[in-house]
Regions:
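Histidine-dependent nucleotide/RNA phosphoesterase domain, centered on the 2H-phosphoesterase fold
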Residues: 1-179
Length: 179
């Protein structure tokens, strides 16, 4: 099964504001469905069920307090002239708390062979761009600063992802609550 560790966005006001940004962005790209909005803390990839059970055991010992998140800006990977992903970033305090949580998760799962190939950068993907050579510098500049409602992260999830022609279908394999 294809799996990852994530924290989800559930605040309807935030989700609707993101959908508005997506519709105002005016680019030929695949928008992320608002029901699939999340921060991927660690991508695990294809794992067998017995490994998922080991992951669940380790995740159950992750401890974190609720995290207040304010969305503050739009960014692009790798850059606005050759974009692949358009994302929304968060304030510095939330960013550090999400980084700390991602590090804690990785530390718990490293003995099982899971390690990120790059440092975690908190971002909420809102578009995936397939066609190359689309310069979206002006769009990014227009949405350089955003101020959406606050989201409070209270759950960490082990998620399964099933890829379909209509986009991924996510399901929860485990939920760890903030303490």
């Amino acid at each position: 099964m294809r799996t990852f560790i994530a924290v989800e966005i559930k605040n309807e006001e935030v989700l609707n504001a993101i959908v508005k940004i997506q519709s105002d962005f005016k680019i030929k790209a695949t928008p992320v469905n608002k029901r699939n909005m999340h921060f991927t803390l660690l991508f695990l990839g294809e794992i067998p069920e017995y490994t998922a059970d080991k992951v669940k055991k380790e995740l159950s010992s992750v401890s974190f307090k609720p995290i207040d998140v304010r969305f503050t800006h739009v960014g692009v990977f790798p850059n606005p002239r050759f974009p692949r992903v358009v994302w929304i970033g968060v304030d510095e305090l939330a960013s550090q708390k999400l980084i700390d949580l991602a590090c804690q998760v990785e530390k718990k799962l490293e003995p099982l062979g899971f390690k990120s190939d790059r440092p975690f950068k908190p971002h909420l993907t809102i578009f995936r761009i397939k066609n190359k050579g689309v310069d979206i510098s002006q769009n990014v500049e227009k949405f350089k600063a955003v101020d959406l409602s606050k989201e409070v992260i209270t759950e960490l999830k082990l998620k399964q992802s099933i890829l379909t022609p209509n986009g991924p279908i996510y399901s929860d394999l485990q939920v760890v609550l903030a303490k």
